[in-house]
Swiss-Prot record:
Function: Plays a role in limiting the replication of viral DNA in keratinocytes. Recruits the host NCoR/SMRT complex to viral replication foci to mediate repression of both viral replication and transcription.
Region (Disordered): 40-60
Localization per record: Host nucleus
Cited InterPro entries: E2/EBNA1_C_sf, Nucleotide-bd_a/b_plait_sf, Papillomavirus_E2_C
Protein name: Protein E8^E2C
GO cellular component labels: host cell nucleus
Family assignment from sequence similarity: Belongs to the papillomaviridae E8^E2C protein family.
Biological process according to GO: regulation of DNA replication
Amino acid sequence: MAILKWKYSRYNSSTELSTAEIATQLHAYNTTETHTKACSVGTTETQKTNHKRLRGGTELPYNPTKRVRLSAVDSVDRGVYSTSDCTNKDRCGSCSTTTPIVHLKGDANTLKCLRYRLGKYKALYQDASSTWRWTCTNDKKQIAIVTLTYTTEYQRDKFLTTVKIPNTVTVSKGYMSI
């Protein structure tokens, strides 16, 4: 308990709370509960829920934002760095900020079935999107799209030569900046 009082006094100038109050607040702040609900006969699903942060006049015994430097969401370092020798940032396949992609366009149900069949070729692509479509178009046909990403252009070319794409599906090659 002495450590808890020390932490509290370190981050707050007032030491009006008792040891029991500090311990109660720390416990409420740091614990999680698990709730179990019935899914079907004989099975259960467990969900973890976090306690909500204390609001109002009750202060936490320590202020974590004083120790942690916060940054904006869009400035998070994701380990992606661009190369300085790249001259065309929009279509450059050699830049580390772009990845080769393929858009598969066609009927939504056909694309969904194709995406499930692609599971056996997982080594030939990196990621596959869900079936999606552009929302603000005047096109009455409403063509659906599945986007596949690759680590290299070689992997994309190997995919396109190996996997049989149905005739009703249009293939568009390109790059996506990440």
